[in-house]
Each structure stands twice: as structure tokens, then as C-alpha cells.
Amino acid sequence: MLGRMYDIATRQSALDLVAQGHSLNSVSKQTGISRAAIRAWQVRIEPLPRMLIDLAPCPRCRPEPGTPDDTAAYSYLLGLYLGDGCISPHPRGSFYLRIACADAWPGLIEACRAAITAVRPEGGVYNLQKQGYAMVTSYWRHWPCLFPQHGAGRKHERPIILEPWQQEIVDAHTWEFVRGLIHPDGCRATNWTTRTIGGETRRYEYPRYWFSNVSGDIRRLFTDALDRLGVEWKQANARNISVARRASVALMDAHIGSKH
């Protein structure tokens, strides 16, 4: 069993005590957790997946491949995955979907968890806490089926092209897709400038949205989506896209807003 009933926070707290110099015996007595469980967590903190219990059918593996039931949630999750997500294999043949979410934006963490749950209601979602961010994680053998952009190496080192069925979802839920891209790789910022009018220097502030990604393919997916939505944008430099026109910022505010 090795403490499978304990959540990630409890496991991490026990490991923190060990890291502070406490012995396994003393941590076990203090927490009531067996030494065997703590020792196992030193090797692997994540709960062991239910290898033989995978009841959720994959919509892409049906005789007639389909899409997730909640396509709006999928469009948002696709944006999150392309921004700060990855799919990593488990030695026994299944996969983890992991989305990195900064601790500074707890609302983003909850939105990410909700999207994963909506796309795969039968599965579990948990946060693996790291320094400054949470790795929102879900285990399923079919994650690569839903995110065929998964592959060896970093995203900016390989082509990122949506499958036709993904593009249909993004076309139907474009704002959700843009929100998913902005949340990990973008922000709403306030710039300012000064002007001298009649001998008086005045400060003017104006908001804008930024999106940054090393992958040219992902930046293109973002700007193509903005074009469909009627949002004006500019390529600020090699990696950054800027939305600064007042009407376009207002449109983004109505559908995206600041992270929280």
C-alpha cells in the first residue's frame, strides 16, 4: 500500500521534515506515517496510477473517432498545453499530462484543474507543488490521443500543427483557445508615457496584452485566432505579440481579462 491514501501535500510535508534532518523514525512517530511509505516517497512522491483500471473511453479511439464531450474546455486546455504543458510517459506504458501554473495565479490553477476534469471527468487531477508553481497533473493512457502535438524534444524544436478535428474545435471556441494561450504565456500590462501640453507634463497610461512563445508555430496559431476574432496585433519582436489598439484591448478585456 505504501500510503496511497495520503495526498501530495501530506507526502511533501513528511519529506520536508526528512530534508530538515529528522530521521525516518522521528518523522514516522510525529506524523503517524509508516517509514516504508516515507522511504517510498523519497523515490516517487506521486501516487501510483491505477494501471489496470482505466475505464474512461478515448473519444479518438472509437471506431468512428470523435471529440471530447466538452469541446469548449478542450479548446482552453489545448491552449494551456501548448503554452506550459507537457505529456510524459510512465514506464508501464501510460502517460501524465502536466500543466505548469504559477502560484501567483491561484485562479489559473483552479481553471486548469476544472478544464482537465471537464475533458476527462472519470479521471483524477492533483497538484504537484514545485518551487513557485504547481504542476497540475492527470494520469491517462490516452492523453497523446487528445494532444497529438506530443513528441520528443521541446515544442519549439518540432512542428506544431493542429489536426483537422482540433482546428474545428478551435474555430468553434476561439476565445477559449486564446484564453488558454494567454494564461500561461501572456499577460495584461499597463504601459505609460508622458506628454508636455502647454508647458505641463502629463502622464498617460494605456493597457495592452502581451503574448510570448519561442515556437513560431504556436505564435502563428495565436495570431490566426486573433485574426478570426477581429483583434488587431503586432509582432513586437522575435518572440512577442502585442495587442495595443484600444478597441482590440477592450475586446480582449471582455473575453480574457487579467489573470488572478
Model-predicted segments: where are they?
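Internal intein/HINT superfamily modules and their associated LAGLIDADG
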Residues: 1-260
